[in-house]
């Protein structure tokens, strides 16, 4: 499956703390790249990693990417969770065949709440997700 690994766009003016998911956009030009998304992407030919906040990729630009992929792996965070759900819904509306997987701390802490948050979320993976995503994408 052609897979998009997404650190989604942030909402305007949000300034958060450093982690492997940097959901903030700010004046600092030094960001951690999304390490945990890069590991499985390296095992899936023809996949793509998009780190939207530091590259100022808009929600609209991100949604358009849905047309080119079969699987979306979205690394969510607690501060951005609601916005991330809306982005997933918009991407699924653009490509109804897109499978959407959420990963990240909120998924691990509250898996049922995550699954029930949006009909766009097809499945979640708690904790470490790198090999599970690769297995899923490879069928």
Please state what every model-predicted region is.
Residues 1-31:
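Short glycine-rich His-centered loop
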Residues 36, 40-139:
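Glycine-rich beta-alpha loop elements in corrinoid/cobalamin-binding modules
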């Amino acid at each position: 499956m052609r897979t998009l690994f997404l650190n989604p766009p942030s909402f305007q003016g949000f300034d958060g703390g450093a982690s492997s998911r940097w959901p903030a956009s700010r004046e600092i030009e030094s960001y951690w790249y999304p390490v945990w998304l890069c590991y499985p992407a390296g095992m899936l030919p023809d996949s793509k990693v998009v780190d939207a906040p530091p590259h100022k990729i808009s929600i609209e630009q991100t949604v358009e990417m849905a047309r080119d992929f079969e699987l979306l792996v979205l690394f969510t965070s607690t501060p951005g969770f609601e916005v991330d759900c809306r982005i997933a819904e918009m991407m699924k509306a653009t490509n109804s065949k897109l499978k959407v997987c959420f990963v990240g701390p909120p998924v691990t802490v509250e898996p049922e709440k995550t699954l029930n948050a949006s009909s766009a979320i097809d499945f979640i993976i708690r904790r470490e997700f790198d090999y599970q995503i690769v297995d899923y994408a490879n069928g």
